C-alpha cells in the first residue's frame, strides 16, 4: 500500500451472534497494510472487548473504536478502558466517540440526551485529565461533576488520579459527528472526525464546518494534522444495479428507522445533500412497516453519492476523488480476507 490516503477496516458491532471470520479479516488487514481496525457498539455487543481480543494477534495496525457510545461509560471509565488498551497494544489505540441519539441514550443507557455538545466537551476534558495524570481529576459539571456532591450524596467523594500511568497522554480522540456544530466541535477539540455517509460532493460544506472549529481559540489541531476517517461502502462489481439494490435496504433503515421520526441525524445528512423529499417518503414508508417499498424508492443517485460501486477502474478513480476532497482514511467493510486484499491493492 503506497503513501497517501490510508485504509481502515470497519468491523462494526455484532448482529444476533458473534461473527465467525473477524479474526481472519483482522489478520488480513494487518498483512495487507491497513492502517486501522475499528469496532463499534450500539445496544448489543460492546466495542472494547472484541477490539482487545482480535487486536491481541496484531503488531502494527492501529485499534480504534468507531464509535463507542458516550453515554455507555462515565468519562473516567472510558479513559480507563482506553489507557488499558493503549498499554496492551503498545500505543496503538484510537478513541472514537459518538453521542448517538435520544432513543438509544435514554431508552438503552438510561441517560439524559439533551445538551450533547456540552456533554461531549465536558466528557473529553475529563478523559484528557485522566490521561495527563497531572493532578486529581475534577470537574465542575454540570453534566459530570467530580467529585460528586450535593443532594443524595455522602459528601465523601475524593478527587483521584489514576493508579495506572497511561502509556500516552495524547491518545487520539476522534468524534463521530454529522451536524455542523458537532463537526466544528470535532475540529476544535479532537484529533479527527469519523463521518458516516460522507459525500465528496459536499466537501465544501464540510470544510466550512471544520474551518469554524479550527479557527476557535485554543483549537487542538489544524487542517494539516487533522484526520478525516470516512466510512465508505466500496463494492467492486460490474453490476452496479444489483449492488445498489443490496445497499438500499441498509440506507432505508438508517434514514427511516434509526432515531425518532423527528430526530434522526442520519436522515438529516441526506436532507443536506438535497434529498429531503426522498427521506420524508422513506421515513413514512419504513415507519408504517413497508420496509421493502421504502428501499425501492431510493434513487440510484442517492446511493451513489456516498458509496463507491463499480469496476476496478471506477472504484480507483472514485477513491482518488474522496482523497482529493480531504479524506485521509477510507474506512471500509469486507466480507472476506480476499476482499481485504483487493481493497488494499487500490490505494
Curated annotation (Swiss-Prot):
The keyword Oxidoreductase is annotated on this UniProt entry: yes
Any single GO CC term annotated in Swiss-Prot or TrEMBL for this entry: peptidoglycan-based cell wall
Source taxon at top rank: Bacteria
Identification of the protein by name: Putative coenzyme F420-dependent oxidoreductase Rv3520c
Keyword Oxidoreductase appears in the UniProt entry: yes
Enzyme kind, highest EC tier: oxidoreductase
Organism: Mycobacterium tuberculosis (strain ATCC 25618 / H37Rv)
Pfam families hit by this protein: Bac_luciferase
